[in-house]
C-alpha cells in the first residue's frame, strides 16, 4: 500500500509493499548493527517460508517508523564515523547566492530546517573505506554490506547449486566481511559513503556482488521542484534503486540537494560541473578551477557520496569526434570540450586531478570517472574517441588509488549487442578491474519512447559480462524530463536487467525468488505471484482487468487461456493421471531413448527415409 502523509512537506510515498514486512538482521563483529531486508510472506497453503529480498527503500516502507521529511532520516552511521577518531568538525563554507543559481524571494527553495556541522578528515588522514580496507580494518559498513549481500542467508551448510557463466567474476557462495574488505582493498569494489551522509545505509558496487542500479533525478531550468525531486528519490528507492544521482541543472541546486541527501538512505551522486556552470551563468568558457573546486567542497560538505568527474576529456581527443554521427552527447563532456577548445589548453579537471583526489579523500567521496566521449549512436560505438578516453580513465584510476580514493568507471552509451562485450573486456583490462558503471547501453537507435527497453537489453548483457552498476534509462530518454511514473518504469526495467545478470552469472541466491514465484504460478497461488513480483501493483492490476472477482484469485486459469487450454492445469491433470496409472514405469522404459513412442532399438532398425 502506498500511503501519502499530507501533513509533511514535501509529500512522499510511504507504507509497506504487499505481503511484505521489514525485518532486520544483527551483526556479529558489530552486534549493534541492524541490517534491513524485506520479507515476503507466502500463502499458508504453500508450506513455504517467507522469501527474503534485498531492500534499499529505507524507513519509508517501515510502518513502525515515523517519517518527518523536515527532520531528515536517522543518522545511522554518525557514531561509526566519529568512533574511528580520524575526523573533525568545522564551520564549513557559507552558502552563496550562486549556489542556488542566484534565486531569490519566492523562487528560492527554502533551506533544509536542520543544519549539521560538516566533518572532514584530520590533517594527514584518509577517511575512505579504501584506506581502511588497505589497513586491514573491517569497518561496520563492511559487515553491514556482507549481511545485505547474503540476503539474510546464514553460511550455507552445503554449497548451493551454481548455474551460470561469470566471465571471470568470483562471486562466493557466502559473502563475509573479510571478503568485502578484500574486494575494496583491491579496488574491485567501492562503498560510496561520504562521512557527511551518515543517513545512508551502506551498500557496495563491484562485479563480485549483486548488480546494482542507479536512478537519475533532478530539476531542469524548465521544470520540476524540490518537492517533486524528493518524492522521485523516495519513489525510486521504493522500487529498488540502489543509488540516486541528482542531476539538477536549474535554480536552487544547493537547497534541493540538501533536502534530498538528508532524506536519502541510499548514496547520492552528482555531476559537480553542472552546478559550477550555473555559477558562471551557463557560459562554459567562463568556468575556472577555482569555481569548480569551491563546488566540490560545497557538495562534499553536504554529503554527496560520489562525483562524476569528466577528467578524461582531453584536448587531443576532441578532433576524434568530428566525424561522428552524433558528436559529443555527454553534457559534461561537451562542456569541457567547449572549454578546452576556447582556451586551447588541457582541461582543468585533468590538470588538477590530484587536488580533486585530496578533496575526495578528506570526505570519502568516491569517483565516478565520467565517459564524456561516450557514443550517442550505435554508429559511433567503440570508436577511437571513446577508447582513447577510456585509456585516460585507467591512468586517472591509478592516481586516485594512490591517494586512497575509491573509483568506478562510467561507460556507454549506445552500443549494438555484438560490440558490448568488447567494452567490458577493455574496461577490465585498462582500468585495473575498477567497477564499471554503464548507461544501458542502448542497443538500437530507432525507438524513442521505448529506450528503457532498448537499453534494458544492453544493460542485462553488460551486467552479465561484469558491469557492477547499471544507470537506468526511462521512456523519456532523449524526449524530456522523467516524471514519477517514468522513474518507476525505468527502475523496474533495470531491476529486471540486473536480476537477469545475477542469474546468468550464477549468483548463489538469485534464483530463490524466481523459483518461489514459479512454484506459486504452477500451483495457481495468484496472490503469491503478485506479491513476489518486482511490481505487485501492476501484476495484480493486469490480472484483475479481466478477472476482477476474489474467486478468480484461486482459479486454476487466467484470461489468456481460460480453463480448458491452461497448460499448467493440463500438466496437473497429466501428473494426476500418471500417478493413477503408473506411467512412471513407462517413462523409465523410454528414458534412455528419449522418445516416448519408439524404443531406441527399433529406431536403429528403421531404414533412413521411412
From Swiss-Prot:
Cofactor binding note: Binds 1 [4Fe-4S] cluster per subunit. The cluster is coordinated with 3 cysteines and an exchangeable S-adenosyl-L-methionine.
A single cellular component GO annotation: cytosol
Pathway(s) where this gene product acts: Cofactor biosynthesis; thiamine diphosphate biosynthesis
Any GO MF annotation of the entry: 4 iron, 4 sulfur cluster binding
EC number of this enzyme: 4.1.99.17
The entry's keywords: 4Fe-4S, Iron, Iron-sulfur, Lyase, Metal-binding, Plasmid, S-adenosyl-L-methionine, Thiamine biosynthesis, Zinc
Pfam families, per database record: ThiC-associated, ThiC_Rad_SAM
Keyword tRNA-binding: no
Protein residues bound to Zn(2+): 414, 478
Group of enzyme by EC: lyase
Signal sequence bounds: none
Catalytic activity: 5-amino-1-(5-phospho-beta-D-ribosyl)imidazole + S-adenosyl-L-methionine = 4-amino-2-methyl-5-(phosphooxymethyl)pyrimidine + CO + 5'-deoxyadenosine + formate + L-methionine + 3 H(+)
Family under the similarity heading: Belongs to the ThiC family.
Function recorded in the entry: Catalyzes the synthesis of the hydroxymethylpyrimidine phosphate (HMP-P) moiety of thiamine from aminoimidazole ribotide (AIR) in a radical S-adenosyl-L-methionine (SAM)-dependent reaction.
Subunit structure, as described in the record: Homodimer.
Protein name: Phosphomethylpyrimidine synthase
Organism this protein belongs to: Rhizobium etli (strain ATCC 51251 / DSM 11541 / JCM 21823 / NBRC 15573 / CFN 42)
Amino acid at each position: 500500500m502506498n500511503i501519502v502523509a499530507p501533513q509533511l512537506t514535501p509529500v512522499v510515498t510511504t507504507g509497506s509493499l504487499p505481503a511484505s514486512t521489514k525485518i532486520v538482521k544483527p551483526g556479529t563483529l558489530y552486534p549493534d548493527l541492524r541490517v534491513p531486508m524485506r520479507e515476503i510472506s507466502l500463502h499458508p497453503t504453500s508450506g513455504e517460508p517467507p522469501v527474503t529480498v534485498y531492500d534499499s527503500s529505507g524507513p519509508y516502507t517501515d510502518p513502525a517508523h515515523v517519517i518527518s521529511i523536515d527532520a531528515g532520516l536517522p543518522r545511522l552511521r554518525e557514531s561509526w564515523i566519529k568512533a574511528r577518531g580520524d575526523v573533525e568538525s568545522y564551520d564549513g563554507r557559507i552558502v552563496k547566492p550562486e549556489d542556488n543559481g542566484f534565486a531569490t524571494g519566492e523562487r528560492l527553495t527554502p533551506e533544509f530546517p536542520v543544519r549539521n556541522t560538516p566533518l572532514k578528515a584530520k590533517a594527514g588522514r584518509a577517511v575512505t573505506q579504501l584506506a581502511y580496507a588497505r589497513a586491514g580494518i573491517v569497518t561496520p559498513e563492511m559487515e553491514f554490506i556482507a549481511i545485505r549481500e547474503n540476503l539474510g542467508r546464514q553460511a550455507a551448510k552445503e554449497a548451493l547449486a551454481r548455474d551460470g557463466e561469470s566471465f571471470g567474476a568470483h562471486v562466493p557462495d557466502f559473502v563475509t566481511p573479510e571478503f568485502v574488505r578484500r574486494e575494496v582493498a583491491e579496488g574491485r569494489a567501492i562503498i560510496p559513503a561520504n562521512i557527511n551522509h551518515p543517513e545512508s545505509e551502506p551498500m557496495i558496487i563491484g562485479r563480485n556482488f549483486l548488480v546494482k542500479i542507479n536512478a537519475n533525478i533532478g530539476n531542469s531550468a524548465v521544470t520540476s521542484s524540490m518537492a517533486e525531486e524528493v518524492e522521485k528519490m523516495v519513489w525510486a528507492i521504493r522500487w529498488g534503486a540502489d543509488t540516486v544521482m541528482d542531476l539538477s541543472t536549474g535554480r536552487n541546486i544547493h537547497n534541493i540537494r540538501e533536502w534530498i541527501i538528508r532524506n536519502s538512505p541510499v548514496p547520492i551522486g552528482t555531476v559537480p560541473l553542472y552546478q559550477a556552470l550555473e555559477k558562471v551563468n551557463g557560459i562554459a568558457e567562463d568556468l575556472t578551477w577555482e569555481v569548480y573546486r569551491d563546488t566540490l567542497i560545497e557538495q562534499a560538505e553536504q554529503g554527496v557520496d560520489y562525483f562524476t568527474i569528466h577528467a578524461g576529456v582531453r584536448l587531443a581527443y576532441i578532433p576524434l569526434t568530428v566525424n561522428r554521427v552524433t558528436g559529443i552527447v555527454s553534457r559534461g563532456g561537451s562542456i569541457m570540450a567547449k572549454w578546452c577548445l576556447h582556451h586551447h589548453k588541457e582541461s582543468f579537471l585533468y590538470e588538477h586531478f590530484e587536488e580533486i583526489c585530496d578533496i575526495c579523500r578528506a570526505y570519502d567521496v568516491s569517483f565516478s570517472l565520467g565517459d564524456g566521449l561516450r557514443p550517442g549512436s550505435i554508429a559511433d560505438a567503440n570508436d577511437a574517441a571513446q577508447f582513447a578516453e577510456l585509456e585516460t580513465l585507467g591512468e586517472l584510476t591509478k592516481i586516485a588509488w594512490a591517494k586512497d580514493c575509491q573509483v568506478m568507471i562510467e561507460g556507454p552509451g549506445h552500443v549494438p549487442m555484438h560490440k558490448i562485450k568488447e567494452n567490458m573486456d577493455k574496461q577490465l583490462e585498462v582500468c585495473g578491474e575498477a567497477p564499471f558503471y554503464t548507461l544501458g547501453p542502448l542497443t538500437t537507435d530507432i525507438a524513442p519512447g521505448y529506450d528503457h527497453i532498448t537499453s534494458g537489453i544492453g544493460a542485462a548483457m553488460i551486467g552479465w559480462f561484469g558491469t557492477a552498476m547499471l544507470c537506468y534509462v526511462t521512456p523519456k530518454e532523449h524526449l524530456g524530463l522523467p516524471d514519477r511514473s517514468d522513474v518507476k518504469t525505468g527502475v523496474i526495467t533495470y531491476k529486471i536487467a540486473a536480476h537477469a545478470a545475477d542469474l546468468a552469472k550464477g549468483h548463489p541466491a538469485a534464483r530463490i525468488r524466481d523459483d518461489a514465484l514459479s512454484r506459486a504460478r504452477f500451483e495457481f497461488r495468484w496472490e503469491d505471484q503478485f506479491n513476489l513480483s518486482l511490481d505487485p501493483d501492476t501484476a495484480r492490476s493486469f490480472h484483475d482487468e479481466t478477472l476482477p472477482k476474489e474467486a478468480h484469485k484461486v482459479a486454476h486459469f487466467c484470461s489468456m487461456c481460460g480453463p480448458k487450454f491452461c497448460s499448467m492445469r493440463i500438466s496437473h491433470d497429466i501428473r494426476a493421471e500418471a500417478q493413477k496409472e503408473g506411467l512412471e514405469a513407462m517413462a523409465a522404459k523410454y528414458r534412455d531413448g528419449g522418445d516416448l513412442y519408439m524404443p531406441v532399438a527399433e529406431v536403429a532398425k528403421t531404414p533412413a527415409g521411412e
